[in-house]
């Protein structure tokens, strides 16, 4: 199930040089920028493994528009390789009857263990020492097969494409799916997860048959299909679902099932694209819409938004509410821009604390890190996954010193935002990303050609176990 992953690193010309390297003057490497630079005939981009602590790619058959990482009992803040993780994903098959929900157990996720990233650009001796440290890895010994993740899967039949799927944070075996048929269904996946946890061979290499299972709830009260759905992090079982007709329904747990309020929240004038419960107030949630607005609602105050504001000049595709700084809400638009707002400033006027126009295609996913309040990741239709640290600011003196030290090695673009921390490529038609809440620094992304698991090298210095004792 593995595949070769090619991502941004450096340009490689396939043409053989006729002269030896000693006869050719050293030419500084030029950073290749997607959307700005083009590849010439015979050139290709290749992955630079040193940019990652871990990088793996795999596919599961049909593409998956949406997935979620499942909470497990393997421990918090895990930093030791190899890693094990669980996830749920829904397919987008050619025929409605061929779709399924997959429960995945992924083991042997290998990677490198490094020392803390140096605070400054060191001298030659420091770099040599760092290189030696970088070569030390939990997984450097042995053949390539020993470094390949093992994937086990159990599949449950799902009629229609899965537009979005989410696992309840308090009970990750309970999942909800939004189907393109217009149905919202809640599932109990405990038997499948137990089977995966107890066996090393169950569903290995994707050989699991598609099983038939009835959902706990099958809600057909929406007037159209939808994508927006979110579980409450504060009240177990409380759920929201929003559709393409601009309506939002509230679900409340009731006697082992759910009671869905038949009267929807109404305030948007076009499709509701995403929903996010407040991480701090159990009765408050936010929504975004094709109408270009973001609305904040209080379920105690009726069916109209408590406040609403124009967020972008195009469709607002996705939002993410910062779990570590609950005043911060990020939004991503169809025009490729994304913004961060301080909700405390909404009523006073301009609440935008950051706005980025780096991406040139629609933003398809945005999510704050679960471990760093200033860090978030974004996916876009330009086939880039970018990671941003809002705490970073441009330091003219430091930048000049760095450029002086590296000018013979690399030509650094001058127009990159200082908050841009990492760019990952290699996937086509990126749809969604999630940070792993229990493995700091790990991101999983899904695209039209499969999944990637990545842990960028330059964010590893925030990991608890990597800090000096």
From Swiss-Prot:
Keywords: Repeat, Stress response, Ubl conjugation pathway, WD repeat. One of its GO terms (cellular component) is Cul4-RING E3 ubiquitin ligase complex. SUPFAM superfamilies: WD40 repeat-like. Pathway: Protein modification; protein ubiquitination. Residues 124-143 have a biased composition (Acidic residues). Residues 1-15 have a biased composition (Basic residues). It comes from the Eukaryota. WD repeats lie at residues 157-197, 221-261, 267-307, 311-351, 358-398, 425-464. Induction: Accumulates in response to heat stress. One of its GO terms (biological process) is protein ubiquitination. The keyword Ligase does not apply. Residues 1-29, 115-150 are annotated as: Disordered. Disruption phenotype: Increased heat stress tolerance associated with the accumulation of HSP14.7, HSP21, At2g03020 and WRKY28. The keyword Hydrolase does not apply. Probable substrate receptor of CRL4 E3 ligase complexes acting as negative regulators of thermotolerance by disturbing the action of HSP90-1 and by preventing the expression of heat-inducible genes (e.g. HSP14.7, HSP21, At2g03020 and WRKY28). Belongs to the WD repeat RBAP46/RBAP48/MSI1 family. Probable component of CULLIN4 (CUL4) RING ligase (CRL4) complexes. Interacts with DDB1A and DDB1B. Associates with HSP90-1. This is Protein HEAT STRESS TOLERANT DWD 1. The gene is HTD1.
């Amino acid at each position: 199930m593995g595949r070769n992953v090619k991502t941004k690193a450096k340009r490689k010309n396939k043409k053989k040089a006729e002269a030896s390297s000693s006869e050719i003057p050293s030419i500084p490497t030029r950073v290749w920028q997607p959307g700005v630079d083009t590849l010439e005939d015979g050139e290709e981009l290749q992955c630079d493994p040193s940019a990652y602590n871990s990088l793996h790619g795999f596919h599961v058959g049909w593409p998956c528009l949406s997935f979620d990482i499942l909470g497990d009992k393997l421990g918090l803040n895990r930093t030791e390789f190899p890693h094990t993780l669980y996830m749920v994903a829904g397919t987008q098959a050619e025929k409605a009857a061929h779709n399924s929900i997959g429960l995945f157990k992924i083991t042997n996720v290998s990677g490198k263990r490094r020392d803390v990233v140096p605070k400054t650009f060191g001298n030659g001796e420091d770099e040599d020492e760092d290189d030696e440290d970088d070569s030390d890895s939990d997984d450097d010994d042995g053949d390539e097969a020993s470094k390949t993740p093992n994937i086990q899967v159990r599949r449950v039949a799902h009629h229609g494409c899965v537009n979005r799927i989410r696992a309840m944070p308090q009970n990750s075996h309970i999942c909800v799916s939004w189907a393109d048929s217009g149905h919202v269904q809640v599932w109990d996946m405990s038997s499948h997860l137990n089977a995966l946890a107890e066996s090393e061979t169950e569903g290995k290499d994707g050989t699991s048959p598609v099983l038939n299972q009835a959902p706990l709830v099958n809600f057909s009260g929406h007037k159209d299909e939808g994508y927006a759905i979110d579980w409450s992090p504060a009240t177990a079982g409380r759920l929201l679902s929003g559709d393409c007709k601009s309506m939002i329904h509230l679900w409340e747990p009731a006697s082992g099932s759910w009671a869905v309020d038949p009267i929807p929240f109404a305030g948007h004038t076009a499709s509701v694209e995403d929903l996010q419960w407040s991480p701090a107030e159990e009765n408050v949630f936010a929504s975004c819409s094709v109408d270009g607005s973001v609305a904040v609602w209080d379920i105690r105050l009726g069916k109209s938004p408590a406040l609403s504001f124009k967020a972008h000049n195009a469709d607002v595709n996705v939002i993410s509410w910062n779990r570590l700084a609950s005043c911060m809400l990020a939004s991503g638009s169809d025009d490729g821009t994304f913004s961060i707002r301080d909700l405390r400033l909404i009523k006073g006027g301009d609440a935008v604390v950051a706005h980025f126009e780096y991406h040139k295609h629609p933003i398809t996913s945005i999510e704050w890190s679960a471990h760093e309040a200033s860090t978030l990741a974004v996916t876009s239709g330009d086939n880039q996954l970018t990671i941003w640290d809002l705490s970073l600011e441009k330091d003219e003196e430091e930048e000049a010193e760095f450029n002086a030290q590296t000018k013979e090695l690399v030509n650094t673009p001058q127009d990159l935002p200082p908050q841009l921390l990492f760019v990952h490529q290699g996937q086509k038609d990126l749809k969604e990303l999630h940070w792993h809440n229990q493995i700091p620094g790990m991101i999983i992304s899904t695209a039209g050609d499969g999944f990637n698991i990545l842990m960028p090298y330059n964010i590893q210095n925030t990991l608890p176990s990597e800090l000096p004792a």
